[in-house]
């Protein structure tokens, strides 16, 4: 599977075209809208979320609630475009209209794509950069991820994300009895945190940052249960599943770090306290005593839950902006201010779910794939039976 997205933050719409989804997958707009609504929630979001109520339009590739095997086109309207029709319109402006427009950006924000992108593409108005580099684009990445999650769900695989740290406040209680319980607790939390006490402290940290004109980041974790053993590859570097997951997490706006399983903690332990001992029983076949590897060894799944964490830096748009330089005059100025969130970590956990789901669904279809969901399901069932008795 693959997809491409198009659209600017304040343009008329966001679009994604998805190729390679097997035929016979049950899919309706609600499946996608539910994920879009989750992305828009979360304590710390800005005023934009009060304007947009994201709803997807399925333009092609689905008929009567079932995928056809042909490309799927999804569109999400930007309601805020009504206020930006001249500024973001595709048609040329008159000289008078150009003078009247007040939205030209010449003061790049530290931490954003503004300056680097303007130099790369030769834009004197950095709005041409920030409109596309905005995290608004993750709307349609979540839409594509919703399709991938539907593929996984049909194959008995569950994806769940939660927040484990915001602004230096770390969740202490992160245990759960089942992945469904994890999902239930996090959906009820304004910051998508399993630890209620830590969640309240996270909310305070967000409030403090907002009152100071600042922003804060954090850490999200995605857990996946139900993956078969041996998905991915050790044969070539670019087919290693952990490498693909790491790249997917790092592709999310403002993410600066990723770890799998115990991650960097492995540097502090001897090998005897890192590697997961192998067990076997007649009912389940091969399992592990621990899951320090986070469900991945040698670029392949172990059959244990996949555990991936990502670090999100504070959003670079600050209401007390840092020093910058006007690219027209070269004089020092404070950076431009765009409407933004104080903290987008809870929402980012939903985006992280989406990109992880996409990589896993793609890997499964590559390994077991045919053009029909029923045949893929049969292939995985045969593989699981083979692995249990290996």
Swiss-Prot record:
Entry cofactors: FMNH2
First-tier enzyme category under EC: lyase
EC number: 4.2.3.5
GO biological processes: amino acid biosynthetic process; aromatic amino acid family biosynthetic process; chorismate biosynthetic process
Keywords: Amino-acid biosynthesis, Aromatic amino acid biosynthesis, FAD, Flavoprotein, FMN, Lyase, NADP
Cofactor binding comment, as recorded: Reduced FMN (FMNH(2)).
Classification via PROSITE patterns: CHORISMATE_SYNTHASE_1, CHORISMATE_SYNTHASE_2, CHORISMATE_SYNTHASE_3
Any Pfam family hit: Chorismate_synt
Keyword Hydrolase: no
Binding positions (FMN): 132-134, 253-254, 298, 313-317, 339
Keyword Protein transport among record annotations: no
GO cellular component, one term: cytosol
Annotated function: This reaction introduces a second double bond into the aromatic ring system.
The family this protein is said to belong to: Belongs to the chorismate synthase family.
Complex formation: Homotetramer.
UniProt name for this protein: Chorismate synthase 1
Organism: Bacillus thuringiensis subsp. konkukian (strain 97-27)
């Amino acid at each position: 599977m693959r997809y491409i997205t198009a659209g600017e933050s304040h343009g008329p719409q966001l679009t994604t075209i998805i190729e390679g989804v097997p035929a016979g997958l049950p899919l309706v707009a609600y499946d996608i809208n539910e994920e879009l609504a989750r992305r828009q929630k979360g304590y710390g979001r800005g005023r934009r979320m009060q304007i947009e109520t994201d709803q997807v339009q399925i333009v092609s590739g689905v008929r009567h609630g079932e995928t056809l095997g042909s490309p799927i086109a999804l569109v999400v309207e930007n309601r805020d475009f009504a206020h930006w029709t001249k500024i973001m319109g595709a048609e040329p402006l008159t000289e008078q209209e150009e003078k009247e427009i007040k939205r030209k950006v010449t003061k790049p924000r530290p931490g954003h794509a503004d300056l680097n992108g303007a130099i790369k593409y030769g834009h004197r108005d950095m709005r041409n950069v920030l409109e596309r580099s905005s995290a608004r684009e993750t709307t349609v990445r979540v839409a594509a991820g919703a399709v991938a999650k539907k593929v996984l769900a049909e194959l008995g695989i569950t994806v769940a994300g939660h927040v484990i740290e915001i602004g230096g406040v770390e969740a202490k209680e992160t245990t759960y009895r089942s992945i469904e319980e994890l999902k239930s607790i996090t959906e009820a939390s304004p910051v998508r945190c399993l630890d209620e006490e830590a969640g309240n402290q996270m909310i305070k940290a967000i409030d403090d940052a907002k009152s100071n004109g600042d922003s804060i980041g954090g850490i999200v974790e995605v857990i996946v249960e139900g993956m078969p053993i041996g998905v991915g590859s050790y044969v070539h570097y670019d087919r290693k599943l952990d490498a693909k997951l790491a790249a997917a997490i790092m592709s999310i706006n403002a993410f600066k770090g990723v770890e799998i399983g115990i991650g960097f903690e492995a540097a502090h332990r001897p090998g005897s306290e890192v590697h997961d001992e192998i067990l076997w029983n007649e009912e389940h076949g091969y399992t592990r005593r621990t899951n320090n590897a986070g469900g991945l060894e040698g670029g392949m799944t172990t059959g244990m839950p996949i555990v991936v964490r990502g670090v999100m830096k504070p959003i670079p748009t600050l209401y007390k902006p840092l020093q910058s330089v006007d690219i027209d005059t070269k004089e020092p100025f404070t950076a431009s201010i765009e409407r933004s969130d104080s903290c987008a970590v809870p929402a980012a956990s939903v985006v992280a779910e989406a990109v992880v789901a996409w990589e896993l669904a793609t890997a499964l279809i590559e390994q077991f794939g045919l053009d029909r969901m029923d045949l893929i399901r049969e292939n995985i069932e045969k593989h699981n039976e083979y692995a249990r008795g290996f």
